[in-house]
A protein has these predicted regions:
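Compositionally biased, intrinsically disordered low-complexity regions
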Residues: 1-2, 10, 146, 151
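Catalytic core segments in nucleotide and nucleic-acid processing enzymes
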Residues: 48-223
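Interdomain/boundary linker segments immediately adjacent to catalytic/signaling cores
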Residues: 2-63, 230-242
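Charge-rich interaction segments
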Residues: 211-242
Length: 242
C-alpha cells in the first residue's frame, strides 16, 4: 500500500474546492498537478530535488541537440503540457500539446542550437517549421486545436530568403527558454518549501500561494502571436509574475 499514491488520488479534488469557480478550466490546476507529480517522485528531503534541477539546467544550456531536447521535454511536462517527440520520417523535433479544460493548443518546435557555417537561420530551417505546422494542422485542427510553429535557436539573424518565407513562424531565443526554466524553478522551489507529501493543508497553502504568480490559459500562444519575428525572454515571460 503506497500512502503517497493514495493521498495523490484525493488532493486534486481538494484543490478544486479552493475557489468558487471550476478550477479544472484554469491553467493553474495543471501546473499544480505537474508540480505535485514531480515532488511526489523527488520528495522534500535530501538532494534529489537539487540534482534534478541542476540536470535540467545543463540540458537546456547544452549545445547538443538531443540533450537539449531531453530537457525541453521535461520542461514542457513541468508546465502542464504533454510533450511529444514524433518518430516518423521528417518529424518535428518536439511538439507540445496542451489541453486545459476546453482550450486546446499545439506548438511545434524545431531546435537549431548547434553552430553552423552560416551562423544564421537558413531557408530550409524555416521550411521545416512550415512543414511541421502543416502536418499539425492536418492532424489536429479539426479537433479544435489552436496551432503555432516555432524555431528555437541561439542564432540572432535570418538569411534574407529565410526571413521572406517565414510568415507566421516565430523564432524563440534559446536564452528565453533558460529564463523560463529559471522562473519555473523559483516557483517550484517556493512551492516545495511549503508542500508536504502527507499534509493536505500544506498542499492547499502551497497551491494558494502559487496561483496569483501564474499566467492565464493560452499564455504561450499569445506570446507566439506577438508582432515580432524573435520571441525574446521579455515577450515569452510577459505574463509570468516576476
Amino acid at each position: 500500500f503506497n500512502h503517497n499514491q493514495d493521498f495523490g488520488l484525493v488532493h486534486l479534488e481538494a484543490y478544486m474546492s479552493l475557489t468558487s469557480y471550476n478550477a479544472i478550466e484554469e491553467y493553474f490546476h495543471f501546473i499544480v498537478r505537474a508540480f505535485d507529480n514531480l515532488l511526489e517522485q523527488l520528495g522534500t528531503r535530501g538532494n534529489r530535488f537539487e540534482k534534478w534541477c541542476n540536470k535540467l539546467d545543463g540540458e537546456l544550456l547544452s549545445e547538443h541537440h538531443n540533450q537539449f531536447l531531453q530537457g525541453f521535454v521535461r520542461l514542457g511536462t513541468l508546465i502542464g503540457y504533454e510533450p511529444i517527440r514524433p518518430k516518423h520520417q521528417s518529424a518535428t523535433d518536439c511538439l507540445w500539446r496542451g489541453i486545459f479544460g476546453n482550450y486546446k493548443e499545439i506548438i511545434t518546435f524545431e531546435a537549431k542550437i548547434e553552430h553552423t557555417p552560416a551562423g544564421k537561420i537558413i531557408a530550409s530551417d524555416i521550411g521545416q517549421a512550415h512543414n511541421q505546422m502543416a502536418r499539425a494542422i492536418s492532424e489536429y485542427e479539426n479537433l479544435g486545436y489552436t496551432i503555432r510553429s516555432s524555431v528555437i535557436t541561439h542564432m540572432s539573424k535570418l538569411m534574407p530568403d529565410a526571413e521572406s518565407s517565414a510568415g507566421i513562424i516565430r523564432i524563440i531565443t534559446k536564452d528565453s527558454i533558460s529564463e523560463l526554466w529559471e522562473t519555473i524553478r523559483r516557483l517550484l522551489t517556493e512551492y516545495r518549501n511549503v508542500w508536504s507529501p502527507d499534509d493536505l493543508n500544506a498542499r492547499r497553502q502551497s497551491a494558494e500561494s502559487l496561483k496569483p504568480k501564474l499566467p492565464q490559459t493560452g499564455w504561450l500562444i499569445r506570446a507566439l502571436d506577438y508582432n515580432a519575428r524573435f520571441i525574446t525572454k521579455d515577450v515569452l515571460l510577459s505574463e509570468w509574475k516576476q
